C-alpha cells in the first residue's frame, strides 16, 4: 500500500495516536515532516501557527509519535545490505549511530544507538535487521574490526567495501548529519538516551517514507 497522507490520517484515527485532537491531523503530520526536513522546532511552530496555534513542544511530540503509523520495512528476500556507523554528540559525550541500508531499494532497515562499538553491538544490531530478511543477505562493511567475528558468528557472508555499493549508507548518514547540523551536530546536555533513540528512529521512519514517494 502506497503510504499517502490519507492512509496516515486513517491510521492515526484508528490507533488513537494522540490523546488530544484539538489540532487538525494534517497539521500534525506536516509539523513532523517539516521538522524532519530540517526546520527547528521553533521555526516549525512559527510557520504552522499561521494556520493553528502550535507550540514547539507539540511539534516535538508529533515528530516522535508519528513514526508509530509509518511503514516498517517489509520482510522479504534481500541481496545486499550495507552497514555503517557514525559518531554523534550528546552533551559532552559521544554515542554511535548505526544504520543498515538495502543496497537495491535504498530503504533503511534499521538504526541502532550504542555507547560502545564492538562485537556485541554488531551482533545485536544485525540481528535486529535480519527480521526484515527472509534469507541471509550479504553484508557490506568498511574496515571496522568489530564486524568480521560478529558476522561469521551469525553465519553471514560479508565483504569489505569502502566506496561504490556502500554509498547508500553514506548517503543516509549525510542526510542525518545535515539534519543534526541544525543543533550543531550535538544533542542537548539534558537529552536522555531513550529520547535520542526515539529521535533517530523517527528520522529513519520519515526517511523511508520520503524515499517511498520518489
From Swiss-Prot:
Signal peptide: none
InterPro entries associated with the record: DDE_dom (IPR032874), RNaseH-like_sf (IPR012337), Transpos_IS6 (IPR047930)
Pfam families: DDE_Tnp_IS240 (PF13610)
Residue ranges the record marks as coiled coil: none
Domain of life: Archaea
Family: To M.jannaschii MJ0017 and MJ0139.1.
Entries under PANTHER family matching the protein: ISH14-TYPE TRANSPOSASE HSIRS44 (PTHR39967:SF1), PTHR39967
Protein name: Uncharacterized protein MJ1466
Amino acid at each position: 500500500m502506497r503510504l499517502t497522507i490519507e492512509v496516515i490520517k486513517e491510521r492515526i484515527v484508528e490507533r488513537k495516536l494522540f490523546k488530544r485532537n484539538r489540532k487538525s491531523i494534517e497539521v500534525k503530520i506536516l509539523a513532523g515532516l517539516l521538522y524532519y526536513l530540517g526546520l527547528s522546532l521553533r521555526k516549525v511552530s512559527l510557520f504552522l501557527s499561521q494556520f493553528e496555534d502550535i507550540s514547539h513542544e507539540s511539534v516535538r511530540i508529533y515528530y516522535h509519535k508519528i513514526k508509530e503509523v509509518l511503514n516498517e520495512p517489509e520482510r522479504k528476500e534481500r541481496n545486499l545490505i550495507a552497514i555503517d556507523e557514525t559518531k554523534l554528540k550528546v552533551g559532552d559525550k559521544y554515542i554511535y549511530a548505526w544504520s543498515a541500508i538495502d543496497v537495491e531499494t535504498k530503504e533503511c532497515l534499521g538504526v541502532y544507538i550504542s555507547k560502545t562499538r564492538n562485537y556485541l553491538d554488531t551482533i545485536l544490531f544485525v540481528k535486529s535487521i535480519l527480521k526484515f530478511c527472509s534469507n541471509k543477505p550479504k553484508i557490506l562493511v568498511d574496515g571496522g574490526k568489530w564486524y568480521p567475528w560478529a558476522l561469521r558468528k551469525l553465519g553471514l557472508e560479508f565483504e569489505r567495501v569502502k566506496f561504490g555499493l556502500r554509498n547508500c549508507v553514506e548517503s543516509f548518514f549525510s542526510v542525518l548529519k545535515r539534519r543534526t547540523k541544525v543543533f550543531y551536530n550535538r544533542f542537548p546536555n539534558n537529552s536522555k538516551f531513550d529520547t535520542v533513540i526515539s529521535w533517530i528512529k523517527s528520522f529513519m521512519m520519515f526517511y523511508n517514507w520520503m524515499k517511498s514517494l520518489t
